[in-house]
Amino acid sequence: EDMDDKENDIVLLSVSKIIPFKNHPFKVDDEQLDQLKNSIAENGILHPLIVRCLDDGDGFELISGHRRKRACELLGIKEVPCIIKELNDDMASVLMVDANIQRENILPSEKAKAYRMKYDALKHQGKQIEMLGNTAELVGKKAGDSGRTVQRYYRLSYLCPDLLNEVDEKKLTFNSGVILAGL
């Protein structure tokens, strides 16, 4: 094993030094947060959070573990186990989406914003991705969604917040939302 490989070392970091991921599209406070809080109170944190260093070198940006961090804050836990990754903005976006997209009960608005973030990040990578084929297919792969489904969610992400909320609350169908977003 390579002794220089610090990528997967687990370190304890102060919760106060960790800021949320910019434009994180997933809701953190939900009914599942209580279950998570109880689990952490009983068993501790089973999976380390994933962070990257902030540009100013003072603190960290959270990539995966927003709900775990929130649960720890509510429990008064001051330090959390973390893995520090070296990632550019695009790769950080991709990892953040992939870490969250497989959760149950994701709202259509969350999935739409997440897919758009990942799609834009992959597109931004450009040449490296072209060899791998259709960007939309790549975006949906982790969650088992087709490229066509990803494109529909991507379009939905342009819907105004009020109507997007209607889709989340099932007052407006997903298909209607996609059509309205395309107008």
Can you say where each PLM-predicted feature lies in the sequence?
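Short, charged/polar connector segments at secondary-structure boundaries
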Residues: 1-85, 92-102
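Amphipathic, charge-rich alpha-helical segments that serve as recognition/docking helices
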Residues: 25-27, 34, 70-158, 165, ...
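Basic, low-complexity intrinsically disordered segments
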Residues: 170
